[in-house]
């Protein structure tokens, strides 16, 4: 599985994640499936509603956020294909918390933000049996 996004969209994610630091930030990936590829056409930031004292290592959104983002993607003729979030002062590797709360068939882009700077970004897909994530290929295009 390869996930394609533009440099501009990657920079949008990096900027949001750096502004969210030292807390986690996140949002939705909007796009479409093309065979084994997922094309990201837009990213939509969503506010972190986790308890303030936990936002440095947890991210959550409301069901209303989810529904609104689905409507927005539908209006564009696209779909919610994934979710992105940051790991402040931690690697771009899914945590067990991420695995427990993830959905199969959704891609997960994780950005490592060290000392306020986005330093790494990786894409992951949860196995159907929810036992672990598998690494995908992130293709950043001009």
Question: What kind of region is each of these model predictions?
Answer:
Residues 1-80, 88-142:
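Conserved beta-strand-loop surface patch within small alpha/beta domains used
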């Amino acid at each position: 599985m390869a996930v394609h996004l533009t440099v501009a969209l990657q920079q949008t994610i990096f900027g949001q994640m750096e502004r969210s630091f030292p807390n986690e930030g996140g949002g939705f990936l909007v796009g479409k499936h093309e065979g084994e590829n997922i094309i990201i056409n837009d990213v939509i930031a969503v506010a972190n509603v986790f308890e303030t004292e936990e936002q440095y290592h947890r991210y959550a959104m409301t069901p209303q956020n989810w529904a609104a983002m689905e409507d927005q993607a539908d209006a564009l003729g696209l779909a919610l294909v994934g979710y992105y979030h940051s790991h402040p002062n931690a690697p771009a590797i899914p945590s067990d918390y991420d695995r427990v709360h993830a959905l199969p068939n959704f891609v997960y882009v994780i950005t490592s933000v060290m000392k306020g700077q986005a330093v790494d970004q990786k894409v992951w897909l949860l196995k159907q049996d929810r036992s672990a994530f598998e690494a995908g290929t992130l293709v950043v295009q001009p």
